[in-house]
Amino acid sequence: MNLLQKLLERAPGFVGIQEKAVDKQKWITRVEDLYKKYIDKKPIEEMVNRDDFRIIRTFHKIDGQEDPFLEKMIDHLAEYKEKVGNAPAGYLLEYNNKIMSRLARAGKMEYKKYLERIDGDMKLTYSVVPQKTMSARQRFTYLYDAEYLLFYKKDGEGYVTSMDAYFKELGEDARAVDYGMAAQQVYTATGGKVPESVILKTKEWTVKALQYTDISLMDKINFLAMLGDTNKVLREYDEAKKCYNQAFMESMQMEQEMTKAMIQMRIKQKLAALDLIK
């Protein structure tokens, strides 16, 4: 097991230096198989340490499905917290949240069962969530009720009500990506076919997201283009054009030429479509 642990620790660096895509993919598959063998063979009690947690975070996939191995981690979270700190709790919180998101978006009320875990067997996990005016369970109830309403019920107004309550609780802890993704989900789930009041709220959220100084370049470009789309829906065509042009200018800073070219082509298409309307 010690040898396998060392191999997994060094694997990312080794895979990264493979020049041929086919060789890289072969090694990725081999390493994934080694990881599965490792967690199958090694008792969970022996994995409560920083090195193994680093390996888990590197190779374990959280895909919104129940996972027997991660359930074992939940059972041993108190030991993880003592030996590793709060990082495992944050990791397991992400695991449960992704399950709730998948179920809520699909309209499966089973997501409420996972909400119950927040102050049940996963209470220690969610103890890392700051509590201001409401419990962790209430906070995430607002969030996943919002996703249920938007993606399954197509209820944009209900979504806004729940998300506003969620953001009020987040307060200063809210990040640019929180506001930006909340706005983007409206278009992802409904194609923008919601009342104008909801579109106006997505504009408010996107403007807030763009006010953050620590926003990544890719997010900034994405949110500017989305703000352009929102202004277009609101028939504020001059404002839409300004947003698209600013998104294009920001894209000039990108280093990956292929990605830059694709993004700029998409922005040019948006500008051309806008000119046909004006």
Spans of features found by a protein language model:
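Oxidative protein folding and maturation machinery
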Residues: 3-278
